[in-house]
Amino acid sequence: MNDNTNGVLLRETYLIDSDTAGIQLQLLRRRRRDIGRPSSGTTLMLIHGATFPSESLFDVPVDDISFMDALATAGFDVWAVDARGYGGSTRPSDMAAPPDTAAPLTPARVAARDLASAV
C-alpha cells in the first residue's frame, strides 16, 4: 500500500486455479476499507498485455499513487490478474525452453481463458 492511502485502502493478493492443472493465477485486489460488499457496477478487472505483469503496469506509484489506488480511492473494487507466465502466476514448463524454440509466452486465446478463470 502506498503512503498516500493512509490505511484507507485494503490490498489483497490471491492465487487461484486456472483451467489447466498445475497452473495458478495471481490476482491483486485493491478496495476501500470503509465500503462493505461491492456491487457489480463498481467492480473492475484489469489484465496486462504481452510485455509486463499487472503489478508493474497498474500498481506502480506515479506522483505517490498507483492506478489501482486511484481507482480504489474513487470507490471501485479493483482486481488485476496475471496471465500464466507473468508476475506471481505459475510459469508453464515450456518457458524453460530456449526462446528460439519455444512458442509465444501466453497466446491471447490462453490469456482470455485465464481472464475467464479469474472472473
In which residue ranges do the predicted regions lie?
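Alpha/beta-hydrolase active-site loop
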Residues: 99-119
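Glycine-rich "HGGG/HGxG" loop immediately N-terminal to the catalytic nucleophile
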Residues: 55, 81-105
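Generic hydrophobic, helix-prone segments enriched in Leu/Val/Ile
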Residues: 26-28, 42, 58, 86
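N-terminal cap/lid segment of alpha/beta-hydrolase-fold proteins
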Residues: 2-39
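Glycine/serine-rich loop-strand microenvironments at binding/catalytic pocket rims
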Residues: 1-3, 75-78, 86-88
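Short, surface-exposed "cap/lid" segments of acyl-processing enzymes
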Residues: 34-80
